[in-house]
Design a protein with these regions (language model features):
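Histidine/acidic-residue-rich, glycine-tolerant segments that coordinate divalent metal ions
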Residues: 120, 142-157, 173-297
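Acidic/His- and Gly-rich active-site-bordering loop/insert found
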Residues: 24-27, 31-152, 156-180
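Hydrophobic h-region of N-terminal signal peptides that target proteins for export
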Residues: 10-17
């Protein structure tokens, strides 16, 4: 491994999402190449010029976004907010949202990739010729609360904001006879696993989409630096299902206790914690452990979220924990099935899109602007979609309350939330407009995204090499 001074490591940590020493060592050359790329395309300066330029068509689109919001979509946001439904159970929300889309002339297909509350809504320009396919993510799931579901992450505003952008742009395209397709992807259950976007991605639901935009409520107006990262560490969601044999507890030797296996496994994982690097996070519960004290439990389930800043070391942790589960099963005469039901990974951030979104947020006088770029994080929470399709998540201030709080939920139905969601819609519409009408910008976006994707693969190879002494050859 290369040697780095403390100063250089601190500097790198401020610029990137790479938080561990190994990550920073692996990423050092990659970061230089990212900086060279950004110097070449000048995303900040270019975005400010694009936003400042007089453009009657763009201004008409943004005005139409505002009219759509004021006339109908603000009330739709409040309606979804007042009727929260948790992930994979958003039936009424989907019914309401898709009926609104149909009223605007968008086709709707409910049920995607085996998910009943996922949908795709599509509008195709009547103009002849091949145009881009523009995508928007729409979320609508609520959080699980101790008393009731609630929209503490303000997902109630995301779909209406996306609708305002999409409809305004569709009307412009039809009037100007511009070819292209607009797709709104209804993605359920952002707040719980298994991650719906990964399921939809692997099923090919997003295939053929050229660009995806989305928005999300936040406590400041900001943007991310270009690079690789994820909001909440790389995650493996894993269930360990132990199966034994029931028996009366007075003759427990006739059974095989699945709960004993689960508890032994859970305890072993606790003993493993000091053997992992300090950045490792392991969070687990035992949601199933038998149904009656007088019956030997023949089924028990341990559910873990295994987290680490990079996916290479995460795979090592996953393998060690899986071995602990197999050992517990072997020791207790039970069987274990390992169900890896969800993954979240580093995503790719595209500077040209992030800076354009931020330039428009500034132009539109968004509140609580943080001028400092934040650490890279993919525009959607799983990371997988960002590696294939360029996109951006618009972040405009919509509440000062903590995330996942009842106060933020209430703010989503007040002026502070309404203002933030409307600005989200305008910024998304502006980004889509430029991508549709500016070939130079479109080429820059795809060139940057492809370059970043290649650099990300180089980064993963560098990580494997950096861990080789500690973990052995992880490429096998």
């Amino acid at each position: 491994m290369k040697n780095y001074t403390i100063v250089s490591l601190i500097a790198l940590s401020l610029l990137t999402a790479q938080t561990t020493t190994v990550e920073r060592q692996a990423a050092s050359d990659i970061i230089k190449k990212i900086d060279q790329l950004q110097s070449k395309i000048q995303p900040t300066q270019t975005a400010r010029k694009m936003a400042a330029k007089k453009d009657r068509n763009r201004d008409k689109i943004l005005k139409r976004v505002e009219t759509l919001w004021d006339d109908q979509l603000r009330d739709l946001s409040d309606h979804i907010g007042q009727n929260p439904e948790i992930g994979f159970q958003e039936y009424e929300s989907v019914d309401t949202l898709t009926k609104v889309l149909q009223s605007f002339g968008f086709s709707v297909t409910i049920g995607q990739a085996g998910l009943e509350t996922a949908f795709v809504s599509e509008w195709e320009s009547p103009a002849k010729g091949k145009g881009p396919t523009l995508g928007l993510f729409a979320e609508y799931d609520a959080l699980r609360g101790t008393k009731e579901p609630f929209h503490g992450c303000q997902h109630n505003g995301q779909s209406p904001a996306a609708f305002a952008s999409a409809v305004a742009l569709a009307e412009f395209m039809e009037k100007q006879k511009l070819p292209g397709t607009i797709k709104i992807f209804g993605t359920p259950a952002e707040e719980m696993g298994p991650p719906a976007k990964v399921i939809m991605f692997e099923a090919g639901v997003f295939d053929g989409t050229d660009l995806i935009v989305r928005s999300h409520g936040t406590d400041e107006t900001t943007r991310n630096k270009p690079g690789f990262g994820v909001c909440c560490l790389n995650i493996n969601m894993v269930k360990y299902i132990f199966e034994g044999r029931p028996a009366h507890q007075r003759s427990s030797w006739n059974g095989r206790n699945a709960l004993t296996a689960a508890v032994q496994f859970y305890t072993t994982v606790d003993h493993l914690r000091p053997t992992f690097r300090p950045e490792a996070v392991i969070q687990g519960v035992i949601p199933e452990g038998g149904v009656a004290p007088n019956v030997v439990p023949d089924r028990a389930v341990v559910d873990y979220y295994i987290r680490y800043p990079d996916e290479v070391y995460l795979a090592h942790m996953d393998a060690m924990i899986a071995n602990a589960a197999r050992g517990a099963a072997l020791a207790t005469g039970t069987k274990v099935t390992i169900d890896r039901y969800g993954e979240y990974r580093d995503g790719i951030t595209v500077g040209s899109l992030e800076e354009l979104a931020f330039a428009y947020a500034e132009k539109l006088n968004a509140p609580e602007i943080n001028p400092e770029p934040q650490r890279p994080a993919g525009y959607e929470e799983t990371g997988f979609v960002t590696r294939k399709i360029p996109g951006v998540s618009v972040s405009v201030y919509s509440s000062s309350a903590p995330g996942h709080s009842y106060e933020r939920w209430l703010d989503s139905m007040k002026e502070v939330g309404h203002t933030g969601f409307l600005l989200d819609a305008k910024v998304m519409a502006a980004i889509l407009y430029h991508y549709l009408t500016d070939d130079s910008f479109k080429k820059t976006v795809h060139m940057e995204h492809k370059t970043m994707a290649d650099l990300f693969n180089n980064y993963l190879d560098a990580l494997k090499d950096a861990y080789k002494e500690e973990l052995g050859d992880t490429s096998k």
